[in-house]
Design a protein with these regions (language model features):
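One-carbon transfer enzymes
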Residues: 1-171
């Protein structure tokens, strides 16, 4: 499976996935490239360090969201992506969601009281939650700082992403 990772800033949920690809830990999985919406996205440096091809489709250069979406979709096609992981890019342009419906992996965070519900899912063609591939919950602990809680949430999300990709590769 040839996967592209979409980012808008830093890597949030795909550090472990990048490492898994680098060390070839998932059979049949390769990262075709990381595509960022801005040239200064910190995620690009991490990807380059792991020998992942990087690309920029700079959103601010386009007159509207539709033309940006078409350019992004064309880049994903150019690098032969057959699966996409959206890491912190929201919203994903409608034409990308439509083209990759059922093959666009996203993470949804839902705060509920003193917990954070984390869901990894395949987006449908309308860009909505489709098939749920994994769920986890992080409870706020009395010793947590904002940073430690956020890191724990991201760690859980990273695990869900890797598990979801493994599941999709095995399907």
């Amino acid at each position: 499976m040839n996967c592209a990772i979409l980012v808008s800033g830093d890597v949030k949920y795909t550090r472990r996935l990048l490492d898994s690809a680098f060390f070839r830990e998932i059979d049949g999985f390769a990262i075709a490239g990381m595509v960022a919406s801005a040239p200064d996205a910190q995620a690009l440096t991490r990807a380059r360090n792991l020998h992942v091809p990087t690309f920029v489709v700079e959103e601010k250069l386009f007159p509207n969201g539709t033309s940006y979406g078409v350019a992004l979709l064309n880049k994903l096609k150019d690098i032969d992506s057959d699966f996409v992981v959206a890491d912190g890019m929201a919203p994903v342009p409608a034409c990308v969601a439509k083209h990759f419906g059922g093959r666009l992996l996203r993470v949804k965070l839902n705060p509920v009281g003193q917990t954070m519900e984390i869901t990894a899912y395949l987006s449908d063609a309308a860009g909505c939650v489709g098939e749920v591939l994994g769920e986890a919950t992080a409870a706020l602990e009395s010793t947590d700082t904002q940073e430690s809680f956020t890191r724990r949430v991201y760690d859980l999300a990273e695990g869900l992403i890797v598990d979801a990709v493994e599941s999709c590769c095995g399907a």
